[in-house]
Each structure stands twice: as C-alpha cells, then as structure tokens.
Regions:
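Extended recognition/assembly regions associated with phosphoester-bond processing machinery
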Residues: 1-66, 70-203
Length: 203
C-alpha cells in the first residue's frame, strides 16, 4: 500500500484517502499560560488551518490522528475545545471528512474533561488495525504486532540535525521509517523534538 510523506508533517494514504498526523498538542500554549508563562496565542489556530489546507489539497475523506491531539487538562480550555469543534464541523461539512483519533498518553491524562464525541471526533480507539496498517500512538507499547503489518505511530517527535560547514547546524523535524514502522513528526507548531540517531536499517 502506498504512503505519501508530506512536507506538512503528515502522511497521505491514497487508497483510503486518509491524512495521518500525530502529536498536535492543542492547548499546550494555554497550559503554559496557566502556569504563568507569557506564551502568545495563535498556535492552535495556525495548526488547524494547516490541517484544513492538507485535507483540501488531497481531498481527504478521513483525518486520522495517532495520539496527543491535546496536551494537558489545564490547556483544554473552552476556547481550545470550541476551536477544535469548529474545525471538525468545517471539514465534515465542506469535504465530508471524518476525524478519527487513536488515544495517546496525553489524552489518557485528561480524565472526564475529554469527551471526544462531543467535540466532533467520529471514532476514538486505543489502536486501529486496517491491514496492512496498524495505527498506534507509541509503538513500543504494542509488541504483539501481526506478521506482515506496518505500524504507523507518533509519540517520539523525531528530529534530525544537519551539520554544515564550520559550526552551522540545522535541526529539522523528520519521519523515521524501518521496514515495518513509520514514526511521524510532531504536527503541532508548539512542540519540542527528540534528535534521532537512526541505526543502519533506518531511514
């Protein structure tokens, strides 16, 4: 099955017309503001607009988020939840796009404050198996993978540092793939990254 890696930090599966992304971390800026840090607003709106653009360009019928859609309980403010709900209504009405979520570790920490079906998510699972694909958040938590399956996950926020001449360095978000797995970069603009040191059979 084909997987198209997109420069917008997401992947596209043409056969099922699915955009796959991970680690948006909506509400992270609000979480920091709640803790007294002077973080400007706007990152959530920017990321949701990027998603709308990807869906429009590829005419995707489904958006599948492999975990950590939201960041923390204190960041799930009425404004953040309303913005995401409006996003879901927009893509469902304009392109008939369903929004599907695989639960991440951050969703599990939200408790009763997280009501996915009340904000426009059409399906919410611990993992989704659609042979040959196996969608999870953290692939290290799912060891019983069927033979021949290909795991698509997030959680790690992979980055790579490119060294230039002198002391020049550029750190970029990246996809990491082996023969049986694909780790997606963090989609959210206001997220950190983990610098990968890929082994020989990893790209």
């Amino acid at each position: 099955a084909d997987i198209v890696l997109l420069p917008g930090r997401a992947a596209f599966l043409p056969k099922t017309s699915t955009i796959v992304c991970s680690d948006i971390h909506l509400g992270k800026a609000a979480t920091f503001r709640h803790a007294g840090m002077p973080i400007p607003e706007g990152s959530e709106q920017h990321d949701l607009k990027r998603l709308v653009n990807l869906i429009d360009v590829h005419k995707a019928r489904r958006l599948l988020i492999t975990g950590d859609l939201f960041h923390a309980r204190s960041g799930c403010t009425p404004q953040v939840l309303e913005e995401f709900s409006k996003f879901c209504k927009q893509v469902q009405s304009s392109t008939s796009t369903d929004v599907v979520l695989v639960l991440g570790n951050h969703e599990r920490s939200l408790g009763k404050k997280f009501q996915p079906y009340e904000i426009g998510i059409s399906r919410c699972e611990q993992e989704i198996i659609e042979p040959p694909f196996h969608f999870v958040h953290d692939q290290t938590k799912h060891s019983n993978v069927q033979t021949g399956s290909f795991t698509i996950a997030g959680h790690v926020h992979p980055t790579i540092t490119i060294k230039g001449t002198g002391r020049d360095r550029l750190t970029c978000r990246c996809f990491v793939t082996t023969g049986t797995t694909l780790t997606l970069p963090a989609f959210g603009s206001f997220t950190g990254g983990y610098n990968t040191q890929p082994p020989s059979r990893t790209r």
